[in-house]
Amino acid sequence: MKRSANPETRAPADARADRPLVLVPADNRMLGEHPFHVAGKKYVDAVRLAGCLPLVVPSAGADEVDELLSHADGVLLTGSASNVNPRLFGQEVNDPSLPLDPVRDTWTLPLARRALELGVPLFAICRGFQETNVALGGTLFQAIHELPDKDSHRSAP
């Protein structure tokens, strides 16, 4: 079923026979010698527990964002072990060991911007909030845990 990306013409989820569809962008990881698209189970489970249908989306082109959003009732930008590339907010990479996911950066920043423009609900966690901030022109501290009185909040996968 094709849904309208325009919130004014998109039928509400309760008017359809299906659950709300939430896009969950995947991370890009190497498992051994092979590239994979992955999403944390805790995020997929949380979407289901909220009564929605999660759809893990592999990397997409910026030209596919509107089409994806036309099918979605919401977007969940998840946390990740990777960071938004500092070059995307006008800084050089301070630490070459910084885990980056340039493929995710390429399409989740336009996805966040467009979802907000269209009024598609967007929920962001950790890296996802950083993506949203950068997509809207904000900047980040590359190593916030190194600032006084700041701790790393990373949890086990």
State where each predicted segment sits.
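N-terminal beta1-alpha1 cap of cysteine-dependent amidohydrolase-like domains
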Residues: 1-123, 133-141, 145-157
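Conserved G/P- and acidic residue-centered "switch" motifs that form tight phosphate/ATP-binding loops
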Residues: 126
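The feature captures the ABC ATPase H-loop/switch
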Residues: 129
